[in-house]
């Protein structure tokens, strides 16, 4: 037996290190010495709980070898002072593993070293005398070897969870995090010996495990002197790596509401979590340093749309690596790599299917929700950039406004420049038509009047029946020269075939710089940094060169050029700048081919929404919309809001509608069948233009286009009478070859699965993909060859690789066979019956294979984007798709015209409007009672101004609205609800109806009336239709009469068709008497029956009848409204009294006038003809009132 205190040669070789390294270690409140000689071979040394009796008993429980060893003793702890090392390991202190560190209690840790230290002498013990090393028996040596095997394989402090190479990488990262200097590869022999004994190798492995454990503990606690001080959050805890990721991205996107992908959820943090909780109704709770709220991944797109509709800018941070790849990667101990890959606003959200969990699995991708006839048209989600310049530098009352509107979902672009008055009615009209979801405005602020209009427009979403409008303020609005240079560079730079993918939103390599040279467009770079050559072509539909596009820009007004530069610059951040590629899609808002309906007209006539709750139900678009496709709904909304001025175009639409109603031929039925299950081709092709379509989407588009193009044979000639209907059979076959060629390039099965890597039917189309696939095949072949070797090692001829939880190429070994598993295999996972391993060779090959797979993903994505760019060059696909939308609109109008009582309007050249048996189109659909028709005729012979009087609730406002709606419907090209309509083309329909204030804009009710009237007077022409309802009622009677009289007199002189509703009989009779050839009086008829109690029973007939009617029957309407009878009686008495007083005053006026006439007659101061004229005027006054000569 060896003597006490002697050293054991086997232990010496076991713990020996040739190139010692210093590794720090620190444990709070733990002053115990780690005595490895006392450690059991099959138990784990616990360092966390120094006071645990269980841990101390574990260190005393050991195999028979350690129990029988003379130096074996329990490990004790002195909590007051650090204890001294035992004599058995005086020469083996852990000085290089655990250096002295101050504890929280102010005591120093005792240190020891695994390397012999001849000069080490404890303070309290003399240096032991040298003695020969004890000799082990054969049984002891056997037990020792068994212990070495167990300590390398079993769980515990020295458990080898991964391969040695990967463990060393982790240790290196921990040392780097601890601030230690790397001295080279640890345990690297410095003696130059290539040969190492088995015991030396085992000793090195144990040392590595111990070193890794200590380094890991050090990195976890951060108590090293060289480690950076952890940043402490508001909770008093250090920021986690995930929180640091969020803070870093949030710092760069302060105005963005961020969602971060974490596992199977998307999480909000900080103030974003509170906002999400408030807006989405989800729970937000404090978690370490931030509030946190989360949503499941499959609900992401739903919540994103909700936040966008509320006006937020939303960013989605996604994980850029999978859990399976991370487990075998070099950064497996670091957090998942994440980037801001999606950025959206309400206007720039183009239904990205990658946000939908079902998009990749669905084989019938639809680009919008199913179309339900009669539902609201899809929102335009327009983005409007606005700039202005004062007309007079001394005042900003009148300004010149430049406006550019882009609809990213469809690629439609509208521009305009116009002068606007102090009340900004022109701007308000354009906003009402365009209905933007987002406004781009200068940060320096516009004029006060403009800001007031924009703020009012964006601030009342509920009143206007739409979502909130988001306002984005833009810095550094350029001057005209800088904006023109920017646009010139934009159209000179050819879009690279493989456009940079949406990837990292914060990567602004291709964005504009704002350095010394503002608004400069940097040329795009290839992956190797070389400049991509410029190209003159800019993908215009007609294939014109960029020089011609620049000439087009020269014709644009200056403010429009500035607005366009602002819009393009903003959309580049979202990857949507390609919307401006096709200048053929540019349309001016105000042009000579369309009627301009003002915002007041849109609201008063209920064109887009009703006035009750701002909804669709009861509006004109609700009545006319029976479209089967989303693109048809959008186009019909444009038709309804912008009636035509071209008689030929109007007749073409009406003729097409008539033929659809009458023609039931085979070709017509085939035309109807085209609309069945039709996806939104325009929106889908626009996504292709942006490079944002999925393979499934693109396949659906191409299949649909091929089906459409195959319906009609080429050169069929004119199969319909209508030229609009003939456009479809004539144009569809022209895209067959192009669509079929693109479709043949795809592997449809893989496209349905969104498999970009295996998408192409011809592998040689993109050789880079095949090259990477070949490299992957080589790796897989090597793995198969290695499998043969593993079968021999494990003696399992049927051994196969398995995949568990996304981890591939696992070698599964039953627990009973683990003894034959080589020590260098890395254990990945285990169950009760099997262990799963990766061999070093598998790790190396799979790592290389993973790199190739990542490269394949990048190359395949670039190839698919290049293919989308190639498809987008054929703009005729979009043109044909828009023709399908035209057919859908005509079919919808034909369905409306099929209702009974509709007629085809007749257009004439001379100014005229004649309506026979006209009806209100929406009222007759909403009410069960039949609508009482009306007749009206405007012409030079019949007069152009009709004054309408009559009782309240008699139908005056409904009748004049019906007349205006009939004109609008006729100039849309639709049939109209009347027996017969003959009209000339009206260039505008102007209305001023109702009474409401605009407190938000600082306008009273009367001020609103006058502002709207002023706008009408400035814009009407002899070919306008004007509707004025009770002008002047917002002020005193005398002022109201004066304003109504003067306004109507002025309009009558212009000669436009006018409907003037009033309760001022004086105005009506005076103007009708003064201008009988232009102005005539009409009223809504009624029956009045006297009741026995002295009251009257009124029956409204709702018929438009010639003549003036003074009675308004306001008390009767109050009775219908349910006012109490005492109030009604008092009101009736007061009304009678006021009427008597008025008649008395009139009799006095008549008496004085008669006296004056007689006096002049007897004095011969007045000619007989003048006397006759005075008598006639007096007679008219008396006949129009209730005063008689007898009174």
Swiss-Prot record:
Q: Which domain of life is it from?
A: Eukaryota
Keywords for this entry?
ATP-binding, DNA damage, DNA repair, DNA-binding, Nucleotide-binding, Nucleus
Region of interest (Mispair-binding domain), ranges: 233-347
Q: Which InterPro entries match?
A: DNA_mismatch_repair_MutS-lik_N (IPR007695), DNA_mismatch_repair_MutS_C (IPR000432), DNA_mismatch_repair_MutS_clamp (IPR007861), DNA_mismatch_repair_MutS_core (IPR007696), DNA_mismatch_repair_MutS_N (IPR016151), DNA_mismatch_repair_MutS_sf (IPR036187), DNA_mmatch_repair_MutS_con_dom (IPR007860), MutS (IPR045076)
- Extract the ranges annotated as region (Disordered): 1-82, 118-148, 175-203
Specify residue ranges for compositional bias: Low complexity: 122-135
In this chain, composition skew of type Basic and acidic residues spans 139-148, 193-203
Q: Does the keyword Protease apply?
A: no
In this chain, ATP is annotated as bound at 950-957
Q: Single Gene Ontology BP term? A: mismatch repair
Question: What Gene Ontology cellular-component terms does the record carry?
Answer: nucleus
Q: Which CDD domains match?
A: ABC_MSH3_euk
Polar residues: compositionally biased ranges: 1-11, 54-65
Q: Where in the cell is it found?
A: Nucleus
- Family membership noted in the UniProt record: Belongs to the DNA mismatch repair MutS family. MSH3 subfamily.
Q: How does it assemble?
A: Heterodimer consisting of MSH2-MSH3 (MutS beta). Forms a ternary complex with MutL alpha (MLH1-PMS1).
Q: What does this protein do?
A: Component of the post-replicative DNA mismatch repair system (MMR). Heterodimerizes with MSH2 to form MutS beta, which binds to DNA mismatches thereby initiating DNA repair. MSH3 provides substrate-binding and substrate specificity to the complex. When bound, the MutS beta heterodimer bends the DNA helix and shields approximately 20 base pairs. Acts mainly to repair insertion-deletion loops (IDLs) from 2 to 13 nucleotides in size, but can also repair base-base and single insertion-deletion mismatches that occur during replication.
Tell me what this protein is called.
Answer: DNA mismatch repair protein MSH3
Tell me what organism the protein belongs to. Answer: Cryptococcus neoformans var. neoformans serotype D (strain JEC21 / ATCC MYA-565) (Filobasidiella neoformans)
Quote the gene name from the UniProt entry.
MSH3
């Amino acid at each position: 037996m060896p003597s006490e205190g002697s050293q054991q040669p086997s232990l010496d070789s076991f713990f020996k290190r040739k190139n010692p390294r210093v590794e720090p270690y620190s444990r709070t409140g733990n002053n115990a010495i780690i005595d490895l000689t006392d450690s059991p071979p099959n138990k784990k040394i616990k360092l966390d709980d120094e006071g645990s009796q269980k841990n101390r008993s574990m260190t005393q429980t050991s195999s028979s070898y350690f129990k029988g060893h003379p130096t074996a003793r329990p490990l004790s702890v002195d909590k007051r002072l650090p204890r001294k090392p035992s004599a058995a390991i005086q020469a083996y202190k852990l000085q290089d593993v655990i250096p002295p560190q101050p504890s929280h209690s102010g005591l120093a840790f005792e240190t020891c070293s695994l390397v012999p230290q001849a000069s080490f002498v404890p303070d309290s013990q003399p240096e032991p005398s040298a003695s020969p090393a004890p000799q082990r028996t054969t049984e002891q040596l056997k037990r020792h070897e068994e212990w070495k095997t167990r300590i390398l394989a079993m769980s515990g402090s020295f458990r080898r969870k991964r391969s040695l190479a990967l463990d060393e990488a982790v240790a290196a990262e921990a040392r780097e995090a601890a601030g230690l200097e790397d001295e080279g590869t640890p345990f690297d022999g410095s003696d130059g010996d290539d040969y190492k004994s088995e015991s030396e190798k085992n000793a090195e492995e144990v040392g590595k495990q111990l070193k890794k454990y200590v380094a890991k503990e050090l990195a976890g606690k951060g108590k090293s002197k060289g480690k950076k001080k952890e940043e402490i959050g508001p909770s008093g805890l250090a920021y986690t790596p995930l929180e640091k990721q969020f803070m870093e991205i949030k710092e760069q996107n302060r105005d963005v509401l961020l969602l971060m992908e974490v596992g199977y959820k998307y999480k909000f943090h900080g103030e974003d979590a509170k906002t999400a909780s408030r807006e989405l109704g989800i729970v937000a709770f404090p978690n370490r340093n931030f509030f946190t709220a989360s949503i499941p991944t499959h609900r992401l797109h739903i919540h994103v749309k909700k936040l966008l509709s509320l006006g937020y800018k939303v960013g989605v941070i996604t994980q850029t690596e999978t859990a399976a790849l991370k487990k075998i990667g070099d950064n497996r101990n670091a957090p998942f790599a994440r980037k801001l890959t999606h950025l959206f606003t309400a206007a720039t959200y183009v239904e990205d299917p990658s946000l939908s969990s079902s998009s990749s699995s669905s084989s019938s991708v639809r680009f919008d929700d199913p179309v339900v006839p009669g539902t609201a048209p899809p929102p335009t989600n327009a983005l409007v950039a606005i700039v202005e310049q004062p007309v007079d530098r001394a005042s900003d009352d009148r300004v010149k406004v430049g406006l550019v509107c882009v609809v990213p979902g469809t690629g439609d672009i509208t521009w305009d420049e116009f002068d606007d008055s102090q009340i900004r009615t022109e701007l308000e009209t354009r906003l009402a038509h365009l209905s933007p979801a987002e406004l781009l405005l200068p940060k320096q602020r516009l004029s006060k009047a403009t800001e007031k209009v924009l703020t009012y427009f964006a601030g009342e979403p509920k009143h206007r029946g739409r979502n909130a409008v988001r306002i984005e303020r833009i810095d550094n609005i350029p001057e005209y020269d800088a904006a023109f240079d920017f646009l010139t560079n934009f159209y000179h730079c050819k879009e690279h075939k493989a456009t940079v993918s949406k990837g990292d939103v914060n990567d602004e390599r291709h964005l504009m710089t704002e350095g010394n040279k503002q608004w400069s467009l940097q040329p795009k770079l290839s992956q190797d940094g070389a400049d991509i050559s410029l190209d003159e072509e800019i993908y215009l539909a007609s294939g014109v060169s960029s020089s011609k596009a620049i000439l087009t820009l020269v014709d644009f007004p200056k403010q429009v050029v500035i607005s366009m530069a602002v819009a393009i610059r903003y959309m580049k951040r979202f990857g949507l700048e390609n919307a401006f590629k096709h200048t053929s899609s540019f349309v001016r808002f105000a042009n000579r081919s369309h009627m301009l309906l003002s915002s007041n007209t849109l609201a008063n006539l209920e064109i887009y929404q009703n006035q009750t709750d701002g909804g669709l139900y009861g509006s004109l678009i609700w009545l006319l919309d029976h479209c089967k496709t989303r693109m048809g709904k959008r186009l019909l909304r444009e038709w309804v809001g912008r009636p035509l001025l071209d008689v030929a175009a109007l007749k073409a639409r009406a003729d097409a509608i008539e033929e659809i109603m009458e023609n039931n031929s085979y070709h017509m039925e085939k035309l109807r069948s085209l609309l069945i299950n039709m996806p939104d081709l325009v929106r889908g092709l626009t996504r292709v233009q942006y490079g944002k379509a999925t393979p499934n989407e693109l396949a659906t588009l191409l299949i649909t286009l091929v089906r459409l193009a195959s319906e009609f044979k080429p050169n069929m000639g004119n199969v319909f009478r209508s030229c609009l209907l003939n456009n479809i059979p004539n144009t569809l076959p022209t895209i067959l070859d192009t669509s079929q060629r693109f479709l043949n390039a795809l592997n449809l099965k893989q496209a349905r699965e969104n498999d970009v890597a295996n998408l192409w039917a011809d592998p040689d189309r993109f050789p880079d993909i095949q090259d990477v696939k070949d490299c992957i095949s080589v790796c897989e072949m090597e793995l198969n060859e290695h499998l043969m070797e593993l079968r021999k090692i494990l003696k399992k001829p049927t051994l196969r690789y398995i995949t568990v939880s996304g981890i591939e190429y696992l070698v599964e070994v039953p627990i009973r066979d683990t003894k034959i598993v080589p020590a260098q295999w890395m254990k990945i996972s285990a169950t009760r019956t099997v262990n799963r391993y990766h061999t070093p060779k598998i790790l190396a090959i799979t790592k290389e294979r993973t790199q190739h797979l990542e490269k394949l993903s990048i190359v395949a994505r670039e190839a698919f984007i290049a293919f989308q760019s190639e498809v987008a060059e054929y703009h005729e696909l979009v043109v044909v798709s828009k023709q399908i939308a035209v057919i859908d609109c005509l079919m919808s109008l034909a369905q409306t015209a099929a209702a009974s009582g509709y007629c085809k309007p007749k257009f004439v050249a001379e100014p005229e409007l004649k309506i026979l048996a006209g009806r209100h189109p929406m009222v007759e659909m909403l009410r069960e009672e039949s609508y009482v028709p009306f007749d009206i005729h405007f012409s030079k012979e019949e007069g152009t101004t009709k004054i309408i009087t009559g009782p309240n609730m008699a139908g005056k406002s409904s009748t004049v609205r019906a007349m205006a709606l009939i004109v609008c419907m006729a100039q849309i090209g639709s049939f109209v609800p009347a027996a017969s309509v003959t009209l000339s083309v009206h260039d505008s329909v102007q209305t001023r109806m109702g009474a409401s204030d605009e407190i938000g804009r600082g306008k009273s009710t009367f001020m609103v009336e006058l502002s709207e009237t002023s706008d009408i007077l400035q814009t009407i022409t002899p070919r306008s239709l004007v509707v004025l309802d009770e002008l002047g009622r917002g002020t005193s009677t005398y002022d109201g009469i004066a304003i109504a009289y003067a306004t109507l007199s002025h309009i009558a002189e212009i000669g436009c068709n006018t409907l003037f509703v009033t309760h001022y009989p004086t105005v009506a009779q005076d103007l009708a008497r003064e201008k009988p050839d232009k102005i005539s009086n009409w009223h809504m008829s009624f029956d009045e029956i006297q009741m026995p109690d002295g009251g009257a029973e009124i029956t409204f007939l709702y018929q438009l009848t010639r003549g003036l009617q003074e009675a308004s029957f306001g008390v009767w309407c109050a009775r219908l409204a349910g006012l109490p009878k005492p109030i009604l009686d008092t009101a009736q008495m007061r009304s009678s009294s006021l009427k008597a007083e008025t008649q008395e005053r009139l009799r006095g006026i008549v008496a004085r006038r008669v006296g004056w006439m007689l006096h002049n007659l007897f004095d011969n101061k007045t000619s007989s003809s003048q006397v006759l004229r005075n008598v006639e005027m007096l007679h008219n006054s008396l006949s129009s009132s209730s005063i008689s000569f007898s009174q």
